[in-house]
Amino acid sequence: KEKEITEFIKNIKEKYKLEKKSKFLCYNTNKKYYFNVDILNNCLQKIFNPDEKDNDKIYQKNFKNKDKAIRNKNDYSDGKMRANGEEAEIDSINDSYHLVRFKYINDNEEESMDKKTFYEEFDLNYACTFHKSQGDGWDDIIIFISPNTTFIKKNAIYTAMSRAKKRCIFISTKEDLKKCQLSAEPIISTFLEH
């Protein structure tokens, strides 16, 4: 499955002239869905960062030099709050000293962190979920909708689309995309009628 998806994404990359800075979004983190965050990140890492050597796989994660990463938890330890969802790029992984040097994208601030902590607090970030992308924007957004994913609501699709500054590309069947556009979150009111 991963090899098939990698080849598929390579074709999309060539067709639309996509770059490493493009953002790939999907709704699912669950591995049972065809397009999920882990599978997309593994495939996109092979495409956009193929030349860097693999490092030790820790916690089922395989970071490389020059990878895109994203915080998966808040950090208040150094007096400067770092939020879940902040993006970074890895400058280097030093196996001898077990250190990762990286730079936060939003402020270009460089930091070092022990490898174990980095692997616990960061994930690959070539792809993320619709919800993790809230508040950010990229020139090119590629939205993957897994086949028969009928539970995605139109407000989630709108959230994903609104992240695009220039182009929004959907990877879906027409039927699945249409089902998502027609479904809406129920409006829940706490107003009591008398």
Residue ranges and their predicted role:
Residues 30, 86-194:
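C-terminal accessory regions
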